[in-house]
UniProtKB/Swiss-Prot annotation:
Record's keyword annotation contains Nucleotide-binding: yes
Protein name: GTP-binding protein 1
Organism: Schizosaccharomyces pombe (strain 972 / ATCC 24843) (Fission yeast)
Annotated gene: gtp1
NCBIfam families linked: small_GTP
Record keywords, A-Z: GTP-binding, Nucleotide-binding
InterPro entries: Beta-grasp_dom_sf (IPR012675), DRG (IPR045001), G_OBG (IPR031167), GTP-bd (IPR006073), GTP-binding_2 (IPR031662), GTP1-OBG_CS (IPR006074), P-loop_NTPase (IPR027417), Small_GTP-bd (IPR005225)
Residue span, OBG-type G domain: 63-287
GO biological process annotation, one example: cytoplasmic translation
TGS domain sequence ranges: 287-362
Length: 363
């Protein structure tokens, strides 16, 4: 029996099983088996087989944004509209057959935009577009491009496909610590009341993955799925921005409704509507900061920003400049919102904020 058949068999058993207190452990175990099989489905079938053309695009720039959506929703047109890249466009499906990169230049940052081929329903199970769905795992932000006339249906299907390949949209990893040991059995502790998980459930799932010795500390009321995600260890938690195209084909009331949805932008490439706002929202969702450097005794250099992730420390700023600079640091001077006074003398662990000016002093 193949992996797909096993998946279908478990899914059928889960549908047949009535959800109640008596069956929750059995269902939890089935979910664990299902997650393991789906992970196998994503593994390459042959180590020596040829790689899909256009899917191994070298990651460049300060961040990567993946365009994902069904065929002919306007991904290629959008890429051409907000970058200098000309991606083939046509009114028929499957115009883009490989991953096409472009660069969005925004306030000193270079953001790589990746136009992935259109996916179809069942892509996560290998029915078409599985490479595109998997390639989205490498992104720092997913831009889900949806046809405004079919928005709800397309969004639901794409979210399902991404969920199956281990992508968790607009979520944080569960606040749980799992430490695998060599002996000592399973130790289960939690700091909050749990309504979905208990020791027996955790024990059953860990044994399914052949983990027999571990310390578990749970700090939030997680679900069984959250715990399986933690055990799998290969989930990607990625911000997603929903981009509704072809809004000229729906009513003004529908445009207004879509625009008010969380993390959503309505656009029209034909009318060049809201493209600048889309760029602004992409920047916000990427959680990037612009940091400026200053030599001792000179004015800050505001012509070229150093792009770092939100929450970055002076150590990471040093690494962005040169990989050995952090080792040579004596101290840093910081001006800006992260400094208690200007300038503040700080060390490697100081967290920088947007617009900070930094002077690095070496030993």
């Amino acid at each position: 029996m193949g992996v797909l058949e096993k998946i279908q068999e478990i899914e059928a058993e889960m549908r047949r099983t009535q959800k109640n207190k008596a069956t929750e452990y059995h269902l939890g175990l089935l979910k664990g088996k299902l997650a393991k099989l789906r992970a196998q489905l994503l593994e390459p079938t042959s180590k020596s087989g040829p790689k899909g053309e256009g899917f191994d695009v070298l990651k460049s720039g300060d961040a990567r944004v993946a365009f994902i959506g069904f065929p002919s929703v306007g991904k290629s047109t959008l890429l051409s509209a907000i970058t200098k890249t000309k991606s083939a466009t046509a009114s028929y499906e499957f115009t883009t057959l490989t991953a096409i990169p472009g660069v969005l230049e925004y306030d000193g940052a270079e953001i790589q935009m990746l136009d992935l081929p259109g996916i179809i329903e069942g892509a996560s199970q290998g029915r078409g577009g599985r490479q595109a769905v998997s390639a989205a795992r490498t992104a720092d932000l997913i831009l889900m491009v949806l046809d405004a006339t079919k928005a709800a249906d397309q969004r639901e299907k794409i979210e399902y496909e991404l969920e199956q390949v281990g992508i968790r949209l607009n979520r944080q990893p569960p606040n749980v610590t799992l430490t695998i040991k060599k002996n000592g059995g399973i130790k289960f502790n939690h700091t909050v009341p749990l309504t979905h998980m208990d020791y027996k459930m955790a024990y059953n799932i860990l044994h399914e993955y052949r983990i027999h010795n571990a310390d578990i500390l749970i700090r939030e009321d997680i679900t069984v799925d959250d715990f399986i995600d933690l055990v799998m260890g290969n989930r990607r938690y990625i911000n997603c921005l929903y981009c509704y195209s072809k809004i000229d084909a729906v009513s003004l009331e529908e445009v207004d409704r879509l625009a008010r949805l969380p993390k959503s932008v309505v656009i029209s490439c034909n009318m060049k509507l809201n493209l600048d706002f889309l760029k602004e929202r992409i920047w916000e969702e990427l959680n990037l900061y612009r940091i400026y450097t200053k030599r001792k005794g000179e004015m800050p250099d505001f012509s070229e920003a150093l792009i770092v992730r939100k929450g970055s420390t002076i150590e990471q700023v040093c690494n962005r400049i040169h990989r050995t600079l952090a080792e040579q640091l004596k101290y840093a001077l910081v001006w800006g919102t992260s400094a208690k006074h200007s300038p503040q003398v700080v060390g490697l662990n100081h967290r920088v904020e947007e617009g900070d000016v930094v002077t690095i002093v070496t030993k």
